[in-house]
Swiss-Prot record:
PANTHER family: GLYCOSYLTRANSFERASE, UDP-GLCNAC:BETAGAL BETA-1,3-N-ACETYLGLUCOSAMINYLTRANSFERASE-LIKE PROTEIN 1. It catalyses: N-acetyl-alpha-D-glucosaminyl-di-trans,octa-cis-undecaprenyl diphosphate + UDP-alpha-D-glucose = beta-D-Glc-(1->3)-alpha-D-GlcNAc-di-trans,octa-cis-undecaprenyl diphosphate + UDP + H(+). The gene is wfgD. Its main location: membrane. GO terms for molecular function: hexosyltransferase activity. The keyword Glycoprotein does not apply. GO terms for cellular component: plasma membrane. This is UDP-Glc:alpha-D-GlcNAc-diphosphoundecaprenol beta-1,3-glucosyltransferase WfgD. Its EC number is 2.4.1.305. It is found in: Cell inner membrane. It comes from the Bacteria. Signal peptide: none annotated. Its cofactor is Mn(2+); Mg(2+).
Length: 253
């Protein structure tokens, strides 16, 4: 199974306090045939030096000459990726040790080209919640809500041709929609917690009205009928309210 190279795409920007833990979680993978492509997006702190502290030849540091955002950093890394499979990990998130081994095994055995998983939510290294995604996500289901965490995704690289991350808000969500629609496939949940998503100040204080506007904008590129677009946005709102109510009930305000 280790015959297949996995290219891990990691964008970074001013992540000196978290990127070492993220890279360490890759080094702990029980699946050994990988390359980690870290693309630094013109950081002003010591992020690049933190990456260079690791001597493993599978870790490759790339740099953008000027800040292009997460989409631009991921796209730069994708240009240098040579793996059969593509995985994604941000510079503040963490993988569990058998993530790649389990997911690649399931994908090969079941002919799955798009896999994601469940993840824990951490804040200051403490677990504050978890996200359990649907077992299968179709294109129409994805239009209602993005249940796919980028940090959990593994793709067959053929799905990315001709796609890359667009320079829009919610760029990962936009890419998943493009892939599922163009290939007429469903994404499949591996069924276990494979990653840890670290809450950042931006995610904690995100403006819900801005998120609604961004969701509306993304839907505009995929749903022509205005009434259908409203339908999908209402689904997005209802799912968000249910999630907020669940979090409030469980003390995760």
């Amino acid at each position: 199974m280790d015959d297949y190279l996995v290219s891990i795409i990691m964008p970074s920007y001013n992540a000196e306090h978290t990127i070492s833990a993220s890279i360490s979680s890759v080094l702990k993978q029980t699946y050994a045939n990988w390359e980690l492509l870290v693309c630094d997006d013109d950081s002003s702190d010591n992020t690049r030096f933190k990456v260079l502290e690791f001597s493993d030849s599978r870790i490759k540091l790339l740099t953008n000459e000027y800040a292009k955002g997460a989409a631009g950093a991921r796209n730069t890394a994708l240009k240098y990726a040579s793996g059969r499979f593509i995985a994604f990990l941000d510079s503040d998130d963490i993988w569990i040790a058998n993530k790649l081994e389990m997911q690649i095994s399931m994908m090969l055995k079941n002919n799955i080209s798009f896999m994601y998983g469940n993840y824990e939510i951490i804040n200051n290294n403490s677990i504050v919640g978890k996200f359990v995604a649907p077992q299968k996500i179709t294109y129409n289901k994805l239009l209602k809500n993005c249940g796919i965490g980028c940090l959990t995704v593994v793709l067959d690289r053929t799905l990315l041709n001709p796609f890359s991350f667009p320079f829009v808000h919610k760029e990962d969500y936009y890419l998943w929609l493009s892939i599922l629609k163009d290939n007429n496939i469903s994404a499949i949940n591996c069924g276990f917690i494979c990653s840890k998503y670290r809450l950042s100040q931006s995610s904690i204080s995100s403006n819900k009205f801005k998120e609604l506007k961004r969701q509306w904008d993304v839907l505009g590129d995929f749903v022509e009928n205005p009434l259908a677009r409203i339908y999908y946005l209402l689904n997005y709102i209802v799912i968000g309210i249910k999630k907020h109510a669940f979090d409030y009930k469980n003390g995760k305000k």
